[in-house]
């Protein structure tokens, strides 16, 4: 009876009423044998194309997530719903759950948002994965073990090419780890002396230093020449004075 009534509401263009009926079934306020309110709601959103789809999803997703996080998450990443207008509320709903990192990755790779917070969170997640492997801290991409190279290549390319993340926040996340990534972020922040020093003395990679200079410009090339022709590390440190 309730399922039939919900379908009747859909046929009459009253999607909200149908969703309310399925919610009552899903939460046990109404009972009908063989009818799962959660499944009915999820199935509805996969085929409904009304202009109010996004607004309805924002309204009814929380109860679906409370009852079945797995089904709610599967709907969100199914690409059958444009969730770009409601990403913030969804992140609030997911909180610190196990689904959050996968959702952030999905959003970053699916939508052209140019959102600083999401881009920064995405980069932070990837960096923290790499930080679990101390062997990666002082090596270039070419020196990275094959098992980690594809994942690392992805975040290195992201840090170089993405203009949306906060380099200051990412530098804080990096701390003293992952020197290659630090070089890239320091270059973005125009801290060229420190970036080049790490490239030469920690990574021992002139190639990485040159890549830094190509991004930073002529002044960086001058610093690199000074580093390459200085006799000791101490001379370089002294030459920085109060700049560092």
Task: Identify the residue ranges that each predicted region occupies.
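Extended alpha-helical solenoid/rod scaffold regions
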Residues: 1-244
